[in-house]
Amino acid sequence: NLLQFGFMIRCANRRSRPVWHYMDYGCYCGKGGSGTPVDDLDRCCQVHDECYGEAVRRFGCAPYWTLYSWKCYGKAPTCNTKTRCQRFVCRCDAKAAECFARSPYQNSNWNINTKARCR
């Protein structure tokens, strides 16, 4: 779920950046998403959105609300969960958190005018 995803992000980036910085970044990080991602970090969010969509289509999951079990080993969020939905959503979140950690954060892409830049 979204709360657990936030903790995964903190795990992967060693708390180097507050989680809320990712809530309104580029064209895809945060609510909704459209157009061409502005950079690699925004592309991580696009892939995460697509992964959640796949969870809904393939398994009928509710990814924003699905609780799962995971642990933080070093900087690696590791899923340890049973059901198909839990496993799939957990992996979506873990992959995105790791992607965030390896992608540069450009302050100029935070809180952008999405109507103008995300076509």
Curated annotation (Swiss-Prot):
GO cellular component terms, semicolon-separated: extracellular region
Leading EC class: hydrolase
Disulfide bond entries: C11-C72, C27-C118, C29-C45, C44-C99, C51-C92, C61-C85, C79-C90
MF-aspect GO terms: calcium ion binding; calcium-dependent phospholipase A2 activity; phospholipid binding; toxin activity
Active-site residues (renumbered): H48, D93
Gene3D superfamilies xref list: Phospholipase A2 domain
Cell location: Secreted
Gene Ontology terms describing biological process: arachidonate secretion; lipid catabolic process; phospholipid metabolic process
Cofactor note: Binds 1 Ca(2+) ion.
Main location: secreted
Binding residue positions for Ca(2+): Y28, G30, G32, D49
Entry keywords, A to Z: Calcium, Disulfide bond, Hydrolase, Lipid degradation, Lipid metabolism, Metal-binding, Neurotoxin, Presynaptic neurotoxin, Secreted, Toxin
Required cofactor names: Ca(2+)
Tissues and organs where the protein is expressed, per its UniProt entry: Expressed by the venom gland.
Reactions catalysed according to its record: a 1,2-diacyl-sn-glycero-3-phosphocholine + H2O = a 1-acyl-sn-glycero-3-phosphocholine + a fatty acid + H(+)
Organism domain of life: Eukaryota
Known EC number: 3.1.1.4
Family the UniProt entry places it in: Belongs to the phospholipase A2 family. Group I subfamily. D49 sub-subfamily.
Function: Heterotrimer: Snake venom phospholipase A2 (PLA2) heterotrimer that acts as a potent presynaptic neurotoxin by blocking synaptic transmission and synaptic vesicle recycling. May act by binding in a calcium-dependent fashion to neurotonal pentraxin-1 (NPTX1) and neurotonal pentraxin-2 (NPTX2), but not to neuronal pentraxin receptor (NPTXR). Also binds to taipoxin-associated calcium binding protein 49 (RCN2), a protein localized in the lumen of endoplasmic reticulum. Monomer (alpha chain): Snake venom phospholipase A2 (PLA2) alpha chain that possesses the same high enzymatic activity as the heterotrimer. PLA2 catalyzes the calcium-dependent hydrolysis of the 2-acyl groups in 3-sn-phosphoglycerides.
Subunit text: Heterotrimer of alpha, beta, and gamma chains; non-covalently linked.
Name of the featured protein: Basic phospholipase A2 taipoxin alpha chain
Organism from which the protein derives: Oxyuranus scutellatus scutellatus (Australian taipan)
Source organism phylogeny: Eukaryota, Metazoa, Chordata, Craniata, Vertebrata
